[in-house]
């Protein structure tokens, strides 16, 4: 049997880039909680002993950004200079400007409304008033290889990262520090199905003087085996023959912002599908939902998941594209990789009929103008069985099935 190896990685909330994502999204949530119409684009940079917060905001409220930064760092676990970073004493600089008026006018009044106001005519749908916050393309993906409709490698990598953080915070494994990464490799058969766990890599920051052999066994028992058992993979896709590598480079004492500088938006593959699907390039964290980089990608996951949940395909990838200041998408594309159970043209027609992908409609349908974003800043934005996220709902299954049946009858 011909097998191919596919790998995906995850990182913990103490990874420098994820620290930045968390800070940016904490600021976003604090603003949206007080001002649902806030326009936010916040970027964070962390380095040894210092946090920079920059970006553009338009809002009617105020939040104490330095206090939010410090609280976030302490919640993650950077609370002592002994580990190279302390949220209580680090420097925090803030350089926030106002959203560009040119961008604001295009988003507040979409091209459709501006053209209508100039030419007159019948009254337009109010959903057409909000233009896309930028041009760009977004992808959504779903597969039936896991109950959460996610690729197995990234789903397992995220579970391992979450568990690594859990055993640290609960003291189940002592001497761990916040920074960490996981990576999972599965063997796939010619039909594209995962058949065997091949390799697991866990790198975790730890206190000085820890024996790596002891740490290896702690991670095997309390992290890897725990997750495999919980996921129902032990003795199934994961027998005892897989390779486990724990801190393969040796000691990992120097981590977090002291080990590497971090930046918002640098873990876009970790945030999405672990490389199993394409990515439009736009990051999520620190962006309010008028930015289609975020809301468009969430909507595409919603679409793709409902396609697969409806039994219309085993795998689905959906692309949407927008022009800045225009409400109506400029493109929509459905790919099912030969796994479709109905003609792709019928599925695509059904998607157009069932889902309104104008930015204002997405905000309304998914109820995105609320503080739900900080919880997604680590361990993935999709397939989160531990969270109730609106884009994970399979509430359009029946409508899609009916629309596909109608489209086939009309052909």
Swiss-Prot record:
Residues that coordinate or bind Mg(2+): 17
Localisation: Cytoplasm
GO MF, any single term: magnesium ion binding
Residues that hold L-methionine according to the record: 56, 99, 260, 291
Keyword terms of this UniProt record: ATP-binding, Cytoplasm, Magnesium, Metal-binding, Nucleotide-binding, One-carbon metabolism, Potassium, Transferase
Catalytic activity: L-methionine + ATP + H2O = S-adenosyl-L-methionine + phosphate + diphosphate
Cellular component GO terms held in the UniProt record: cytoplasm
Record's function text: Catalyzes the formation of S-adenosylmethionine (AdoMet) from methionine and ATP. The overall synthetic reaction is composed of two sequential steps, AdoMet formation and the subsequent tripolyphosphate hydrolysis which occurs prior to release of AdoMet from the enzyme.
Protein name: S-adenosylmethionine synthase
Organism (species): Corynebacterium jeikeium (strain K411)
UniProt gene name: metK
């Amino acid at each position: 049997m011909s097998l191919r190896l596919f790998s995906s990685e995850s990182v913990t909330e103490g990874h420098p880039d994820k620290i930045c994502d968390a800070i940016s999204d904490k600021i976003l949530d604090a603003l949206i909680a007080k001002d649902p119409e806030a326009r936010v684009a916040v970027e964070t940079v962390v380095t040894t002993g210092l946090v920079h917060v920059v970006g553009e905001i338009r809002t009617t409220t105020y939040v104490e950004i330095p206090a939010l930064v410090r609280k976030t760092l302490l919640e993650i676990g950077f609370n002592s200079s002994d580990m190279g970073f302390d949220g209580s004493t680090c420097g925090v600089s803030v350089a926030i400007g106002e959203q560009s008026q040119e961008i604001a006018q295009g988003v507040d009044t979409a091209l459709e409304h501006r053209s209508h106001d100039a030419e007159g005519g019948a009254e337009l749908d109010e959903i057409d008033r909000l233009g896309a916050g930028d041009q760009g393309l977004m992808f959504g993906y779903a597969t039936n290889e896991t109950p959460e409709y996610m690729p197995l490698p990234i789903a397992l990598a995220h579970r391992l990262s979450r568990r690594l953080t859990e055993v640290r915070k609960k003291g189940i494994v002592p001497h761990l520090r916040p920074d960490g990464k996981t990576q999972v490799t599965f063997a796939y058969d010619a039909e594209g199905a995962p058949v065997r766990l091949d390799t697991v890599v866990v790198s975790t920051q730890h206190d000085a003087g820890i024996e790596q052999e002891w740490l290896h066994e702690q991670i095997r028992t309390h992290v890897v085996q725990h997750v495999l058992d919980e996921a129902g993979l032990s003795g199934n896709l994961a027998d005892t023959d897989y390779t486990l590598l724990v801190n393969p480079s040796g000691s990992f004492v120097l981590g977090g912002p002291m080990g590497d500088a971090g930046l918002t938006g640098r873990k876009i593959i970790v945030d999405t599908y672990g490389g199993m699907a394409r990515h439009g390039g736009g990051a999520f964290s620190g962006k309010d939902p008028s930015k289609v980089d975020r809301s468009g990608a969430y909507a595409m996951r919603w679409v793709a998941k409902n396609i697969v949940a409806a039994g219309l395909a085993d795998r689905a990838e959906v692309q949407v594209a927008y022009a800045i200041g225009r409400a109506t998408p400029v493109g929509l594309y459905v790919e099912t990789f030969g796994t479709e159970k109905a003609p792709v043209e019928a599925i695509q027609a059904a998607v157009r009929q069932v889902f309104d992908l104008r930015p204002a409609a997405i905000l309304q349908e998914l109820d995105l103008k609320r503080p739900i974003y900080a919880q997604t800043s680590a361990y993935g934005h999709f397939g989160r069985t531990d969270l109730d996220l609106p884009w994970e709902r399979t509430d359009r299954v029946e409508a899609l099935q009916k629309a596909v049946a109608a489209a086939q009858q009309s052909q």
